[in-house]
Amino acid sequence: NKLIFKSKKFSKYNINKYKLYENDNIILGDDGGNLFIFSINEKRIIRKYNFYKNKFKKIKKKINFLVANNIIFVSDNLGYLYAINYKKDKVIWAKNYKIPFRSNLKLYQNKLIATNQNNDLFFFNKTNGDLIKKIPTEETLVKNEFINNLSISKNNLFFLNTYGSLYSININVM
């Protein structure tokens, strides 16, 4: 085992446990809301992006992100949902839905799928962030640290919520 490369520290904040890979780039996020695009070929950070204004600077961000075709889709615990073209360093769209998102993100055809802390399941238009459909499920009375989980298999979307219920939805009818 030979060390090929070691970078300097990316951030003063904790790095998100999820790392994504696309086109020889590693995409990381941190608790400060920063997104880092690290080029494996160039062995350096080629982009650093922070969507948040100074008024959110002291708030710890829990960001969930997904990448497809040079677009990073992001949801957070502040209620924001946004899409960034990381190659062009440009925000495509951004929306504030005013309730914290609390799940991984999924893409299916032209839909971006997420859930919030109230166990509501959302389908958004991935090109503009507009809400297509909202499906409420049971709400938990006690807030916990469980993160809702989304998974897609064939034509089914599986949704495990914080209440502990598992839903299976035919995604083609959404």
Regions found by a protein language model. Give the residues of each.
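Extracytoplasmic beta-rich repeat domains
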Residues: K2-N23, R44-N69, K90-Q109, L131-K154
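Short loop/turn segments that connect beta-strands within beta-propeller blades
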Residues: N1-K2, S39-K43, N85-D89, N125-G129, ...
